Amino acid sequence: MTDLAAKPGIRTVFIVSDGTGITAETFSHSILAQFEMKFRQVRIPFVDTVDKAHVAVSKINEAFHVEGMKPIVFTTLVDAEANRIVHQARATILDMFQTFIEPLERELGLKSSHAIGRFHQNADTEAYKNRIEAINFSLAHDDGQSHKNLAEADVILVGVSRSGKTPTSLYLAMQYGVKSANYPLIPDDFERGKLPTVLYEYKSKIFGLTIDPQRLSEIRNERRPGSKYAALENCRYEVNEAETLMRRESIKWLSSTHKSIEEIATTILQDIKMERDAY
């Protein structure tokens, strides 16, 4: 099948898991980022039966035959038989459980639970409910939409439009269960030289994001090409005014220009001294 073929010079990577595959995919991103080449990732989740394992092997082998190169396969499969079947694929297999769990079993003198999906909470756990609550809160308080219940916020992000506030807020909620609100800093705020009035009561929760004006202009031009909103001169003005305002108000801030969402979120958690386990 042609849709299984990667472009020349691009290696195909399969993520095979008996759960969502998010854990293996995150790990694979960290590993593959060490190599200066492009990869095409294909996730095969919920491989929790022998039949599904055979289907996964068929897809992997097809990619091998089409491309003439062994695919790279990251696996997190608890079921021994399903794992054995996948290991028969024409591929380079990187078995995360075999790599880490077996040495730990020997060191701890204990057998692991071998429970499928143990890492992620079930829908009826308290942690899962807290995470959903945080996501709903962050969505309701995105881009200054609502002033209600701001006292419940763990953090309030401020910055000019398109500086990374929304994705960071949602990442904090989804990954750490953090209730994050975010507010845009706009020309009216710059003219007054003050934060939005509603935020002063919660100033201790505020963290700022800024961004390089050139990069901001590029991002805004994707949304509103040729507009004053996206013009480089306007972006320079807004960024300068926002940074001046944050300095005046003694608000801690960082530049999102060259940082990933994960790096931004980790910095914020450290700053507000919140210790949260990732879900």
Curated annotation (Swiss-Prot):
ADP binds at residues 159-166. Belongs to the pyruvate, phosphate/water dikinase regulatory protein family. PSRP subfamily. Pfam families: Kinase-PPPase. This is Putative phosphoenolpyruvate synthase regulatory protein. One of its GO terms (molecular function) is ATP binding. Its EC number is 2.7.11.33, 2.7.4.28. PANTHER family: PYRUVATE, PHOSPHATE DIKINASE REGULATORY PROTEIN 1, CHLOROPLASTIC (PTHR31756:SF3). Keywords: Kinase, Nucleotide-binding, Serine/threonine-protein kinase, Transferase. It catalyses: [pyruvate, water dikinase] + ADP = [pyruvate, water dikinase]-phosphate + AMP + H(+); [pyruvate, water dikinase]-phosphate + phosphate + H(+) = [pyruvate, water dikinase] + diphosphate. Bifunctional serine/threonine kinase and phosphorylase involved in the regulation of the phosphoenolpyruvate synthase (PEPS) by catalyzing its phosphorylation/dephosphorylation. It comes from Ralstonia nicotianae (strain ATCC BAA-1114 / GMI1000) (Ralstonia solanacearum). The lineage of its organism: Bacteria, Pseudomonadati, Pseudomonadota, Betaproteobacteria, Burkholderiales. HAMAP family: PSRP.
